[in-house]
Amino acid sequence: TAPDPTTFRDAWRILEQYEVARKVPASVRRRLEAGMKKTLPETPKAGAVLFRRVDNLLIGDNQAAVDAVVKAAKGKRLQTLVLSTTVTGEARELAKFFGAIAREIATHGRPLARPCCVIAGGEPTVTIRGQGKGGRAQEFALAAALEIAGLPDVWVAGFATDGTDGPTSVAGAVVDGETTARARRAKLDLLSALQDNDAYPCFKKLRAHIVTGPTGTNVNDLYLLLAL
């Protein structure tokens, strides 16, 4: 439905960049090599005949989702701050940043005074270190719970706009300053769970999941900090 500007050689360069070109299945390697030798056709590019009567219209994006959050927050008379609509990097590192902002708000009333809502959109990643179950939004929330532990009237949430975070049936999770205390009472070790990338079981037991079901759209994720 849309031209693909990438090539077989682009894919091969990425494999080489991460030093996995000789580790992928032989069938994948053979296909890429055939494409680079032009014995396999590239995907359709801009200017191809089949696109002459095709128009692609972008009717929604992460900016639209963030704008909707801002509108809803202002409707509740909250001050708002949008950090970015293109966040990337490790989900747990993003959580540390949100935690630092939460503590700055709680301690000094900046960059916003309460009541306020800090918003970011995008799609961070997770480097798999363990054998657990979860997704980037749940990993963000799990790490954030550790960062905001003890802060009163502060909530942090992360969720995927398509309603599916990683290989799970939930969109994400929401935590507050008391999440770690509730976890201890439930005999859950959140730090160990984070190290094992095992956010899903923790939030299931704490009943902290955000469950929307399939939303019919996908404009990356939303990450929120609410301080009242």
Task: Please provide the spans of the model-predicted regions.
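Accessory alpha-helical/coil subdomains and C-terminal extensions
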Residues: A2-F97
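Gly/Ser/Thr-rich active-site loops/lids in small-molecule metabolic enzymes
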Residues: A2-Y18, G130-V156
